[in-house]
Amino acid sequence: MQINLITGISGSGKSVALRAFEDAGYDCVDNLPVSLLVNLIITLEKEQCERVAVAIDARRGQSIADLPSTLENLRKSHQVRIVFLNADTNTLIQRFSETRRRHPLSTNAKQPQSATLIEAIDKERNLLEPLRAQAHSIDTSNIPAHALRSWIQDLLKDKPIGLTVVFESFGFKKGVPSEANLVFDVRCLPNPHYDKVLRPLTGNDKPVKEFLEKIPEVVNMEADITQFIHRWLPHYIADGRSYLTVAIGCTGGQHRSVYLVNRLSEYFRKQKDFGILQLNFLDRHRELDSIPVAKS
């Protein structure tokens, strides 16, 4: 059975992620107590369920500490994937303010709401840190709900085994993705933004590709990043990791980083050098994916 555990910081988008799993045909359970997880899996096995997504949060406090060992036992006979939703504290405070909902771990109403909320968020981060360390982490601070749904849909296309390498473009204007394991700063490369014709386009467009692929610095940067990843990827695999996020950043996350992420993703998808190792590759464009989808 494929077991997908959805967890993370309250307000980071767990409900959106769970709905994406449900839309993909998974049996879904929300807010399941940790103590009931094993019994749930046994019941679903009897019903011949093949795929399940379970959302668990930290509202039951210290019981979450038992979850890593529970998951380790489940991995002996099932495929287990953990999806961890995260966001920076300021974004979470804003979201709770907009929805006027209380944080599940907010218990002291005598203090100002902002102080109580910050304490609750910090407590939740500490409780969930052991899970985040072994999960596929998604920072939702700068992405809307539709982008998160799209990213989850892409994730579901991959097998929940082996190492998943995520190539993600971003703009430094909005900060470095918190889930990034490797960060490459490509702001030193010539910027298509200063070409009036190329400015409204993106790294996905042919004119921008043709512009960048002719620049020696871009070619050398791509070669150096490729060589670095190619050399060290086997070591990350040997380290037992399930996920590796390679973030490429330029100023706005529109041209240079998008182009290089596409090039890297295309290159590594074609590689056979890693033998029988099972590798999955995903590519994301944080700033482009955040653009609202036009309604038809």
Swiss-Prot record:
Q: Which Pfam families match?
A: PapZ_C (PF22740), RapZ-like_N (PF03668)
User: Where along this sequence does the record place binding of ATP?
Assistant: G8, I9, S10, G11, S12, G13, K14, S15
Top-rank taxon of the source lineage equals Bacteria
Annotated GO molecular function terms are: ATP binding; GTP binding
Keywords of the record: ATP-binding, GTP-binding, Nucleotide-binding
What residues does GTP bind to?
D57, A58, R59, R60
Establish whether keyword Membrane is in the entry: no
Q: Which InterPro entries does its entry note?
A: P-loop_NTPase, RapZ-like, RapZ-like_N, RapZ_C
Role according to the record: Displays ATPase and GTPase activities.
Family membership noted in the UniProt record: Belongs to the RapZ-like family.
> What's this protein's name?
Nucleotide-binding protein Pnec_1620
Q: Which organism is it from?
A: Polynucleobacter necessarius subsp. necessarius (strain STIR1)
